[in-house]
Amino acid sequence: MENECIFVSSRGILKSTNIHTVQFSSSNPLILLDDYKNITKGSIVYVCNSAIKNFIQTVLPTLKDTFVLVSGDSDVSVPDDILSITEFNSFLEDPRLQHWFCQNLVVPTNSIHRKLSHLPIGLDYHTISSPGNQHPWGLHELPTVQEKQLLEQLEKNKTLQQKVFLAYSNFHHAIWGIGQRGDRQEAVNKIPKDCVYYEPNFTSRDVAWAHQSQFHYVLSPKGGGYDCHRTWEALCLGCIPIVKSSNLDPLYTNLPVLIVKDWSDISQTLLKETYETFSKTRFNMRTLYLSHWVARFKEESAKC
């Protein structure tokens, strides 16, 4: 269902490949060999980032043809959390690997291999899409219905007379958890309080979308991994996400994202100057759309 949506999402990417597991489970480190027995020349293969090492050990030795790899659906950093540098480089140089599109890729910008491309985690349509799944974000809704809600909010935003020159925050309701989210606590400690509107209470996601749409900026520290769904929600809603500089910076090329070296760099002056600059800049928003990435996958597949 996510592959029928307009905007890029983790599961939309997964379901747009022609070889992938049929039992979706985020951060699953194991490969089901039967899911990968039909890889042929030009196949676009999806593997959970947590299972990359298992894929290299169990599936790769059985392959003869060149393929395109797409990976994500996990908070682990690639390669740091899953492969040694030797294993990583050896895999990249394997002639059967045509190209690798990877989420949470933390290779230094100046040493990106020619076969590597950053891939956004995009929106999260899957968390509340399972029937009977109760979640603080809201009631069960199909991915297409969730996207319809987002598009309706985007349409409402056109009637806003003026946005507030502050950065909206709701991440502070989940400071601790996966990976301890130390970046979030650092953001709270360092960002001047007069630059931020902190949502006083935890809200459902649709309410959060409505509230953040009233502000020019949205604070987006790390999620469970380096990338965060909040960043992509903000962009889709017409807000400017603020992120701390990292090896993910290439993901934001040609997008209205404010990247700061340190959270303490944020100021009222920076917010106003950035808005003035961005309002005169022509951005290319194509990376927000699932169709862009599917076309990229097929382009590499055609080279096999």
Regions picked out by a protein language model, each given a short descriptive name:
Residues W263-S264:
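Short helix-start
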Residues M1-H229, I240, K244-I259, T269-C304:
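Nucleotide-sugar donor-binding catalytic core of glycosyltransferases
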Residues L235:
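Short alpha-helix at the nucleotide-sugar/activated-sugar donor binding site of glycosyltransferases
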